[in-house]
């Protein structure tokens, strides 16, 4: 079915490589968190119960033992220096660990609120959001980044506040993005038949997982995205941007 004839009730969008450039995430957000984590922890270590909980959760992930084993002197206690080093270790390895994502979101929040950060979105995103909302569709987000971090990108975007267009947010608490059950969980949470949800992503494995749960899927080929193999191109519907989806309509 051509994109121009497609119907749906919900558009579920990925962020990195779909609404937002991969370079913004990897070249701006990740370095910002890495460079500011020690200062953030020093300021909140004693005063924030949320940070204390994140620190406890970080110590429970499998990579924590791996990291401490690499240290010349094993730490006798957990302190700012140890957690700072571990967070930077996780960022360098691009590991999608839930407490890391939560901590990054808190650090980024400070950056957005001070104006040091502004969320990148591609030029076609605002118009598509408006068109889908006007057509009566709901827009939801599913990203490995925490819900808080998702909201910051759209609230403090380079084109202004886009958060009002979004009706739901999902992160790894609902499941990993290449697992079919995650998309079944999202459909259940949204109260929609999976076939009425259109998932937009740049990752073939995510698209395959969503399709196996009954969702419609399209893969974005944005600048900077990982090139697709011939088999991936053949087995997926592909678009370069959202412009061909402005005519999305609700099912009759």
From Swiss-Prot:
An example molecular function term from Gene Ontology annotations: magnesium ion binding
Question: Where is the protein localized?
Answer: Cytoplasm; Nucleus
Q: GO:BP terms for this protein?
A: L-methionine salvage from methylthioadenosine
CC per GO annotation: cytoplasm; nucleus
The record's annotation in Pfam families points to: Hydrolase
Q: Listed disulfide bonds for this chain?
A: none
Class of the enzyme per the UniProt entry, highest EC level: hydrolase
Q: Which reaction does it catalyse?
A: 5-methylsulfanyl-2,3-dioxopentyl phosphate + H2O = 1,2-dihydroxy-5-(methylsulfanyl)pent-1-en-3-one + phosphate
The family database entries (CDD domains) matched by this protein are listed as:
HAD_EP
* Residues where substrate binds: 143-144, 177
Keyword Magnesium in annotation = yes
Query: What Enzyme Commission number(s) does the record list for this chain?
Result: 3.1.3.77
Highest taxon of source: Eukaryota
Cofactor(s) demanded:
Mg(2+)
Binding note for cofactor = Binds 1 Mg(2+) ion per subunit.
Keyword set for this entry?
A: Amino-acid biosynthesis, Cytoplasm, Hydrolase, Magnesium, Metal-binding, Methionine biosynthesis, Nucleus
Q: Pathway, per UniProt? A: Amino-acid biosynthesis; L-methionine biosynthesis via salvage pathway; L-methionine from S-methyl-5-thio-alpha-D-ribose 1-phosphate: step 3/6; Amino-acid biosynthesis; L-methionine biosynthesis via salvage pathway; L-methionine from S-methyl-5-thio-alpha-D-ribose 1-phosphate: step 4/6
Query: Which residues hold Mg(2+)?
Result: 14, 16, 202
Q: Which HAMAP family match?
A: Salvage_MtnC, Salvage_MtnC_euk
Per the similarity annotation, which family is this?
Belongs to the HAD-like hydrolase superfamily. MasA/MtnC family.
Q: What does this protein do?
A: Bifunctional enzyme that catalyzes the enolization of 2,3-diketo-5-methylthiopentyl-1-phosphate (DK-MTP-1-P) into the intermediate 2-hydroxy-3-keto-5-methylthiopentenyl-1-phosphate (HK-MTPenyl-1-P), which is then dephosphorylated to form the acireductone 1,2-dihydroxy-3-keto-5-methylthiopentene (DHK-MTPene).
How this chain assembles, per its entry, is: Monomer.
Q: Under what name is this protein listed? A: Enolase-phosphatase E1
């Amino acid at each position: 079915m051509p994109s121009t004839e497609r119907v749906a009730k919900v558009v579920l969008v990925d962020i990195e490589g779909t609404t937002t450039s991969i370079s913004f995430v990897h070249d701006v957000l990740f370095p910002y968190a890495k460079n500011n984590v020690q200062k953030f922890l020093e300021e909140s270590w004693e005063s924030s119960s949320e940070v204390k909980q994140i620190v406890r959760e970080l110590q429970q992930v499998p990579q924590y033992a791996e990291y401490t084993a690499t240290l010349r002197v094993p730490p006798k206690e957990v302190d700012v220096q140890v957690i700072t080093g571990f967070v930077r270790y996780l960022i360098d390895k691009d590991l999608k660990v839930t407490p890391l994502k939560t901590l990054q979101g808190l650090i980024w929040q400070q950056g957005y609120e001070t104006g040091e950060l502004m969320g990148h979105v591609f030029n076609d995103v605002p118009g598509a959001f408006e068109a889908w909302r006007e057509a009566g569709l709901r827009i939801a987000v599913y990203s490995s980044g925490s819900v808080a971090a998702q909201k910051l990108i759209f609230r403090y975007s380079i084109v202004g506040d886009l958060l009002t267009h979004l009706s739901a947010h999902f992160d790894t608490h609902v499941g990993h993005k290449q697992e079919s059950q995650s998309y079944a969980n999202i459909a259940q949470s949204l109260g929609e038949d999976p076939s009425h949800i259109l998932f937009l992503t740049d990752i073939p494995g995510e698209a395959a997982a969503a399709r196996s749960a009954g969702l419609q899927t399209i893969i974005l080929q944005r600048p900077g995205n990982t090139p697709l193999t011939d088999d991936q191109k053949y087995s997926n519907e592909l678009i370069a941007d959202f412009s061909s989806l402005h005519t999305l309509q609700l099912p009759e």
